[in-house]
């Protein structure tokens, strides 16, 4: 019997063939084990391949054991080619296998994969691969350790091995734990407050559920980009923080210095600010500048050292970390939605008027803290598919988590969400089927089109003209999800379109193509503003997946900034649209203003600095006001309709329009 530390030592070490063979012998007790690993032909991309033996499980499934040494590309970033090797496991000399446990060892690094490959038999079945990524750089690896301990306890069967590699179980476990933390965070006794209107003491828990979901979204994004070494671990290390924060009490319920000093400065003054522009806010008359550091009094180190603490983090842009506080200089009313403020004034009961309060214990409590929860799970920036899944929390699976949290914020589904343990989402295979069928239908449901989507597609040089025509048709599509929720459909559309484009044009760049598709082809609408933010979060993580590793010698550490998606994903009621007979919003006399508005939003998509975004948003507002004047001069538009259009601001992440117009809000006429 192996204990947890023995398993952890095995999984956290670099791969050793003899050590692995010993593990197979002790853990699985295979009935057929080669005395020496039997060399097998290595496919393209591998230096060596070995067949180690096979076993018959308690439920009569035959499972083979294989090892490949991977020579081309990092095993931690390369999966599609590995899955294509599985058909080679069917060899008359060994007999047929129902499944295989395969090690892919990267000879150029310490990383290695352990994959459970199912559905090998039969030419019509597309093999499924479920994978753990192991090695010294992969952290504590709590998930595989606990899963293999359970496998050892219940006994080795096909069903129990598949359970040990189950992504669905992982997601459900994570959601249940996160939901318990969410309920704790929103409980009034926990004491979390966000000021909202600073003049009203009674509203500082208004929409507290959405505020906590937004906090979770921002933190989970940070957790993902930690996988790319873009944020230092020291910002989440309790012991190191004791030397940074003044009077830091991590278990305290009456102190929120960590959220204010570390997380708010990370979100709003670091990830949302260019590296060269980072500084502390000092001018008392410029409280509206929400990209400057605050709370120097909460640190035990000087301001220069604080800037150095955050100095290795790139500027990401994108709006996810834009402070949502609204000031009277630009609006009729001031609202502290995020509560990022130097003003420490309090009401008579001690609650902040302008500043958010989140207790330290919510993050660091030994039993219930969020960081302990997150550290118990493995995260991956790789995007899973129905046929190829790493057993870790990936961006798509987190969509399921957020879909359930969003269901809790809806009064109609709140009680069901509390009891459901995570069922308010469309399963991935169904989403993928819907997306594929929609694209095939739009592109022309022919045998050639379907072949491009088939798992066994192979590029045919004689069809180059057809591929070019298909590429042109694909890039001309405008696709809208009118109730995008947490973004499952837009994410699947992005993945399918990218995969098809890569198949028919292997020369395209994945990162640039994703940006182009997001800018020109994919749109989303949802009545909940927080749902729109989650959709954008998932698209951002998808973009991060394709970034090159950081390069400290280059500006912004070699990391491109994220686009602004405010005019691509909007919060509105898609059920309320103009009457078909009135869809003349962009008639000839409005064309010039319309084109100017579209150009401003195109520029805003790529805008990087706070000043540039403000300039474009002010310009956008003027153009919208001009269009309203022109609309009032045209027949066919009611006063109510014009009023709704006039008050819609695409850059207000807290607001949802009671009206939806794809022409007005997205600048597009033809959608699928």
Task: Give the predicted meaning of each segment.
Residues 153, 227-233, 473-476, 480, ...:
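Class I S-adenosyl-L-methionine-dependent methyltransferase module
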């Amino acid at each position: 019997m192996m204990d947890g530390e023995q398993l952890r030592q095995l999984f956290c070490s670099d791969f050793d063939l003899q050590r692995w063979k010993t593990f197979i012998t002790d853990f699985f007790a295979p009935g057929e084990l080669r005395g020496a690993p039997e060399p097998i032909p290595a496919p393209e991309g591998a230096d060596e391949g070995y067949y180690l033996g096979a076993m018959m499980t308690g439920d009569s499934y035959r499972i083979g054991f294989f090892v490949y040494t991977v020579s081309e590309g990092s095993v931690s970033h390369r999966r599609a080619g590995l899955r294509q090797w599985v058909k080679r496991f069917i060899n008359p000399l060994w007999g047929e296998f129902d499944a295989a446990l395969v090690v892919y060892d990267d000879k150029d690094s310490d990383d290695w994969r352990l994959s459970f490959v199912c559905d090998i038999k039969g030419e019509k079945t597309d093999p499924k691969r479920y994978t753990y990524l192991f090695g010294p750089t992969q952290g504590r690896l709590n998930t595989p350790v606990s899963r293999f301990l359970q496998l050892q306890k219940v006994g080795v069967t096909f069903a129990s091995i598949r359970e040990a590699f189950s992504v669905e179980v992982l997601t459900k476990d994570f959601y249940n734990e996160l939901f318990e933390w969410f309920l704790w965070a929103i409980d009034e006794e926990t004491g979390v407050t966000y000021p909202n209107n600073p003049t009203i003491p009674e509203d500082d828990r208004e929409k507290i559920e959405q505020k906590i979901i937004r906090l979770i979204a921002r933190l989970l994004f940070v957790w993902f980009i930690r996988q790319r070494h873009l944020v230092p671990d020291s910002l989440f290390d309790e012991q190191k923080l004791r030397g940074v924060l003044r009077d830091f009490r991590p278990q305290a319920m009456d102190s929120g210095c960590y959220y204010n000093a570390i997380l708010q400065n990370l979100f709003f003054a670091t990830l949302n600010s260019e590296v060269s522009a980072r500084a502390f806010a000092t001018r008392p008359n410029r409280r509206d500048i929400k990209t400057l550091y605050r709370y120097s009094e909460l640190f035990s180190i000087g301001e220069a050292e604080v800037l150095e603490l955050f100095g290795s983090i790139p500027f990401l842009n994108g709006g996810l970390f834009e402070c949502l506080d609204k000031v009277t200089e630009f609006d009729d009313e001031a609202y502290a939605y995020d509560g990022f403020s130097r003003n420490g004034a309090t009401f008579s009961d001690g609650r902040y008027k302008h500043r958010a309060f989140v207790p330290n214990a919510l993050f660091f409590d030994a039993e219930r803290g969020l960081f302990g929860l997150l550290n118990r799970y493995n995260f991956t920036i790789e995007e899973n598919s129905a046929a190829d899944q790493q057993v870790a929390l990936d961006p798509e699976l987190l969509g399921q988590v957020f879909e359930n949290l969003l269901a809790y914020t809806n009064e109609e589904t709140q009680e069901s969400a509390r009891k459901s343990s995570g069922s308010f989402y469309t399963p991935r295979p169904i989403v993928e089927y819907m997306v594929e069928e929609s694209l095939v239908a739009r592109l022309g449901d022919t045998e050639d089109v379907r072949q491009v989507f088939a798992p066994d597609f192979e590029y045919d040089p004689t069809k180059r003209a057809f591929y070019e025509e298909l590429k042109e048709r694909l890039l001309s599509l405008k696709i809208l999800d009118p109730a995008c929720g947490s973004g499952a459909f837009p994410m699947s559309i992005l993945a399918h379109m990218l995969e098809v484009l890569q198949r028919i044009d292997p020369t395209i760049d994945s990162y640039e193509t994703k940006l182009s598709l997001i800018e020109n082809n994919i749109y989303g609408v949802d009545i909940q503003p927080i749902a729109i933010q989650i959709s954008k979060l998932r698209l951002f993580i998808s973009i991060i997946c394709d970034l090159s590793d950081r390069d400290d010698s280059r500006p912004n550490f070699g990391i491109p900034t994220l686009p602004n998606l405010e005019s691509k994903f909007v919060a509105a009621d898609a059920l309320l649209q103009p009457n078909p007979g009135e869809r003349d919003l962009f008639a000839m006399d409005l064309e010039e203003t319309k084109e100017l508005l579209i150009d401003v939003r195109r520029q805003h998509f790529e805008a990087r600095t706070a000043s540039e975004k403000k300039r474009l948003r002010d310009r956008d507002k003027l153009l919208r006001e001009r269009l309203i004047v022109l609309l009032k001069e045209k027949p066919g538009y009611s006063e109510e309709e014009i009023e709704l259009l006039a008050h819609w601001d695409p850059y207000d992440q807290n607001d949802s329009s009671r009206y939806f117009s794809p022409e007005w809000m997205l600048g597009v006429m033809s959608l699928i």
